[in-house]
Amino acid sequence: METTQTSTIASKDSRSAWRKTDTMWMLGLYGTAIGAGVLFLPINAGVGGMIPLIIMAILAFPMTFFAHRGLTRFVLSGKNPGEDITEVVEEHFGIGAGKLITLLYFFAIYPILLVYSVAITNTVESFMSHQLGMTPPPRAILSLILIVGMMTIVRFGEQMIVKAMSILVFPFVGVLMLLALYLIPQWNGAALETLSLDTASATGNGLWMTLWLAIPVMVFSFNHSPIISSFAVANREEYGDMAEQKCSKILAFAHIMMVLTEMIFVFICVLSLTPADLAAAKEHNISILSYLANHFNAPVIAWMAPIIAIIAITKSFLGHYLGAREGFNGMVIKSLRGKGKSIEINKLNRITALFMLVTTWIVATLNPSILGMIETLGGPIIAMILFLMPMYAIQKVPAMRKYSGHISNVFVVVMGLIAISAIFYSLFS
């Protein structure tokens, strides 16, 4: 008896210890969240002045952590290990709701994948012509080479995708922090002049309006919901009944890393420019690095901008691929199940990969203008799935009831409603 208890304690200790796979997932979560959007965040978050920026910096960690922890717990609440979000949704809410949410989940993530395929083609094309002085190959060939390159990583499976993303995080963070250090001598006091409530109210749209419209910017700057289901399933297989504690720990470290690196970069950029500069950059709809390169006449920044963007887009593409594949697979499986049929998962993954390759290549080649609007329409769906669905499940699903009664749940619902209302306002204003 004593030996059994000792071995059980030893087993729990070994599972609670930090592992190499935990680091890999931590960096994978970071890699999915921090995409090319980081290059626009200093403009979108800083244009309202320092007061809204400081408030957003305070809200960033709890908003990101509690929401993503809720979605992770939702996936972990499924009866059977190995169930992804599309299966858990059906288990908790029924077949009809399961099909609808799976469809919405796919169409919220898939357009982001298409946007990234266009973005990486545009970025590499521009880098070749402006920085390297080369004539880029025809767009159809260039986009095919780039997408096949990223899809090659996909062919090696989920572990390789997460490993590739975690490796790409290091050069990305390194270059971002070097750039931040490079900008410190350029600091001026203009941004600090907005460090009062009176000035903040007079800046841009006013303090409360600026904060309201900035919440969705923060949500999507730290959003990594497309990889959460894969993350939860993998950790449940590895840690069993300790998966929830382990997932929460990995999420916390990933979110601290996200908030610190991104907000340091944002504050340093904002302190290097005046509010008028940030407003001009927003009006021209260019990234912060493109604006800084022109503003300070710094060729080094002009070189760094596309390199940072290429790394950021690649790792975010891989993370979003996992979510899009899950949604597509879920739709196919549910459709076949309704007809009394099934399909082998490896075969389905190959079909999904081919579909993703062909469609992302066509869209990257054609570069349709409607794509941005489709991606924007997916915003409220992502916010609902990330913020509201897990909180609703806590009230309605017995397996989630143990997480009720916490003030953090109210916080997540409030932030979710603020984000969704601001997205709709931005869409229709």
From Swiss-Prot:
UniProt-annotated location(s): Cell inner membrane
Family stated for the protein in its record: Belongs to the amino acid/polyamine transporter 2 family. SdaC/TdcC subfamily.
Membrane-crossing residue ranges in chain numbering: 23-43, 47-67, 100-120, 141-161, 164-184, 202-222, 250-270, 298-318, 348-368, 370-390, 407-427
Ranges per topology, Periplasmic: 44-46, 121-140, 185-201, 271-297, 369, 428-429
Keywords: Amino-acid transport, Cell inner membrane, Cell membrane, Membrane, Symport, Transmembrane, Transmembrane helix, Transport
Highest rank taxon of the organism: Bacteria
Organism: Shigella flexneri
Keyword Chloroplast part of the UniProt annotation: no
The protein's name in its UniProt record: Serine transporter SdaC
GO molecular function (one): symporter activity
